[in-house]
């Protein structure tokens, strides 16, 4: 049985510890103070950037080199013997003691009948990719230098340092020679926009009297009987500073290049029908049997278990088809782990039961513990 897990389709990117300063993790975050560019039909056409948007396809010469030889597993057997009865019982007692409503008596008094070692392999392929997108962006124009002369370099010609491998990260840079000054489309170049709270009137309904002008038989003091008070949002002016241009009336527009580094992970657990829930292995460590890293890895071909070889070939082909046309594959890494799982058969109170000891941490899983008592009470 094969259990596969993939995170390739997730959209969120999380910054790694070595993500460069000035980067931001949320793809929706804007690097400036909230200014947005005017509609695309108001912007000039920049050669090489006629169609902005996601997935700027990298040039063909940016692709990784083809692997020269298949990835080979070490020439040895990968059988882990079952753990000893003493260690299995110690793990079981510790497990029972951690459950407030489990009696530790079965774990201490049980009689072992069989311990079976179950070889379970976890195959993981990581493909570290770089993708680039382009879009118009802007910031309030305060008289800064306008870089609008010269030929703009192509999206993949702009050098951007690569962060630590296999760590998600995102960074935005300004494309050189694409800047231009435009009037603010949000406020029609005025620097101010109508106050939404008072609808440009400068006054709002009195909250004290509800606009009646009176409270009972008395004239309302806060509004002096008018039922209206000065708008607190705009100070009675009726307009507020434009949030797009920050009151400048002009925007410095430019093409923004957004670079996303993403670690796309394919994980498969090759289970031999042991009856063990493999989802429990997500945070469990095993013995590393193979680590292979290259710009593009070749499927494993010599592993003793043919299911692992088949899974490796499927994963490599899938990632190549999924990312080679829209991203730049920077590095790949594949690993094979042997996760120790021992199925323990035991007898207690003349009944047979089963539990599993798994991982190098010797965790325990069982679904039919003999004695469960409800000894907890609410004081």
Across the structure, where does each feature detected by a protein language model lie?
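General marker for long, soluble alpha-helical cores
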Residues: 150, 166-168, 177-182
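Serine/threonine-rich low-complexity intrinsically disordered regions
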Residues: 180, 191, 203-205, 216, ...
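Cys/His-rich zinc-coordinating modules
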Residues: 3-6, 20-25, 31, 39, ...
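PEST-like, low-complexity acidic/proline-rich intrinsically disordered segments
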Residues: 1-15
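Eukaryotic extended interaction platforms
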Residues: 171-172
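General zinc-binding finger modules coordinated by cysteine/histidine
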Residues: 186-234
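Segments that form or flank anion-binding pockets
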Residues: 156-159
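WD40 beta-propeller repeat blades
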Residues: 228, 236-239, 246-253
